[in-house]
């Protein structure tokens, strides 16, 4: 498995279909798993997810996981990481969506550079406008970069592909 995409689900029935379809419609799907973690959502989010996954006929492997009680976003991310088999991990929040070639471009860059972390540009969408965000990162050791990514120092979580070994070994 090359890429594990982790999607948290809690009270996102308005957004989760677009999010999941943006993963399903990626140009690179051959060695991708999508781990959806239900954090005891009170709405119909998981019914939407389950229908999309049941109807899906492609090569992405899906894992649907469920917490026994609501534990919060950090616990959801940890559950996803602990169940991930990919060399790289991408976190996609349920209200986010990806450009169709995002995984392909990021994975190619990771292979070309043997990167621990790949950052991508992204769009931020607001009610009245959209804003293009270009990513630049200073040279730091890989642990400091990982910490910065996880606390939002380098933008949103969706624009990063992080080597799984950074999580597991640190």
List PLM regions with ranges:
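Nucleotide-sugar donor-binding/catalytic module of glycosyltransferases
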Residues: 1-170
